[in-house]
Structures are given as structure tokens and as C-alpha cells.
Amino acid sequence: MSALTVYLDNQPQFGELYTDFTSIKNQLNKIGVQFEHWTANCKLSADADQASVLAAYSDSIDKLKEQYGFQSVDVIKLNPDHPEKVVFRQKFLAEHIHDDFEVRFFVEGRGLFYLHVEDNVYAVLCEKGDLISVPANTTHWFDMGENPEFTCIRLFTTPDGWVADFTGSAIAKTFPTLDEYVAKLS
């Protein structure tokens, strides 16, 4: 189940929870974030590489490239046994911005995006089939949990792909992790 919690950036212990897809979409649209549910029903093998994932979802990728002019696409696929899961998690947990507009399409698993917009933090739990955009220069971070299990197609408007400018803020450490967030929803 996708979910959104909107917090004041100085009150990570209190937030307004939305679990209805239309409500999530409407709240995110207010800050210029696109949130959609796409079909993610291609069967991927456990060892599917980037080329296999991109081939399986080529129609969706082509549609997005045509619509937004994306110049680069990659796949991030992590599982609990990934040897660099801790390194990746720490990198993505640091608040950062990108100069370009980016889109994430979750084709397996889930992850938690935090969008820091003005005085609010929007925690968006993305699940299989969710597509989320992050507007250029939006401060954000991402948590995949201690034992990640997700496959996500990432699309960028620049040929360089994922290039982050880290803010140096420690705000991410004050908000619930993916594991804490999901436990609270249960």
C-alpha cells in the first residue's frame, strides 16, 4: 500500500497520513510532484540485470522519454544480500538535490522518498507500480531500509544520470526510517 505522511520539518514525530491514492496524488500535485500508478507486471528473474529490466519495460520507458525528453535511464536493483547495500543506503539517506527533473518507476518492492519542500517534509512510501517525479532542485532523500528489496527504473533529463548535490543537513536522521515507517503503518 502506498502512503504519504506530511510533517512539519521540525516535528518528525507528528504527521498527517494519507493512504488513499487520490489523496496522495492531490497532496503531491500541490508541490509539483507527479505520482501515478503504472502497470508493473513483467516477471523478472531474481538475477535480472539492467538490460533485462529495461527491455521488459521498454514501452513504459519509451512513453516517458517521449513525454519528458529524458536523456538517460538506469536501473537500481538491491536485495538484502547486495554487498554494497549499506554504502548505497547511506548515500541515498543524505539530503540532496539534483539540477534536473527525475522520475522513479518502482517495478518491484518498495522504498521511502522524503521531499523537503519549504517547511514540510513529505514522506512518500512507493510500492511496486508507483511512479514518482522529483522536480529539479527539490531537496530530498531516499530510504530503502536495512534489508532492501526493490527494483526501480530511474529516468533523467541529463545524459549524466544520477548526480547529487548534498546539502550537508542532518534532517534525515530525525525522521523515521523506512523500517520504522512501515512498522507504524501496520
Spans of model-derived segments:
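Conserved short histidine dyad/triad with adjacent acidic residue
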Residues: 75-99
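Short, solvent-exposed loop/turn segments at secondary-structure junctions
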Residues: 85, 113-115, 122
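Short, conserved beta-strand element in jelly-roll/cupin
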Residues: 97-117
